[in-house]
A protein has these predicted regions:
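Extracytoplasmic thiol/disulfide redox context detector
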Residues: 2-86, 159-163, 167
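Short, intrinsically disordered, charge-balanced linker/junction segments flanking boundaries
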Residues: 23, 175-176
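Cysteine-centric redox/oxidoreductase cores and disulfide-bonded domains
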Residues: 84-173
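Short beta-strands and strand-loop turn motifs
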Residues: 47-49, 146, 176
Length: 176
């Protein structure tokens, strides 16, 4: 596990720099995480970081009402896009995405609910251990979680996608 933490930290630093530029040109599309009717008359795109306390507050205080009154009634198509301010938020996103679109929102709900626990767990290993617990609740195994966290191509694609979204929509903070 110590090797995994060293690898993840090294890959994170590299990806946020020069490899992100490469991802712009040769990346496969990143799956949009969508709730609600894809043909709804209104589209809301939320930009959030898994480590952002204000994003966690939005997901506990505002999002449930938005979901019940607008998303589940077919009035709104809700798109969730991650923002990567730090490696911990990136790792959380990678684990949530590893579970696929059907389980993604359940996992991020848990990640926001338990954000104070996992994001303050201490060192890298402790944080990955806490994030892995959430992934396991969604049915992911250790091998799946480790494979997702070590997938450098996916990381490169996500970083390129994130940077393109930030530039296109001029996102400077979260939640947006």
């Amino acid at each position: 596990m110590k090797f995994l933490m060293t690898l993840l930290s090294t890959v994170w630093i590299a990806m946020m720099g020069t490899l992100a530029a490469q991802a712009e040109t040769d990346k496969p599309p990143v799956t949009e995480m969508i709730l609600g009717d894809v043909n709804a008359p209104i589209e809301i795109i939320e930009y959030a970081s898994m480590t952002c306390p204000h994003c966690a507050n939005f997901h506990s205080d505002v999002y449930p009402q938005l979901k019940a009154n607008y998303i589940e009634t077919g009035k709104v198509k809700f798109v969730f896009r991650e923002v990567y301010f730090d490696k911990y938020g990136m790792w959380a996103s990678m684990i949530a995405r590893c579970a696929g679109p059907d389980r993604f929102f359940g996992i991020i709900d848990q990640m926001f609910e338990k954000q104070k626990t996992w994001s303050r767990a201490g060192n890298d290993l402790a944080i990955v251990t806490e994030l892995s617990k959430i992934g396991k609740l969604a049915g992911l195994g250790d091998d799946q979680i480790n494979a997702c966290l070590q997938d450098a191509d996916n990381l490169r694609n996500l970083v390129g996608w994130y940077k393109a979204n930030m530039e296109e929509h001029k996102i400077s903070g979260t939640p947006s």
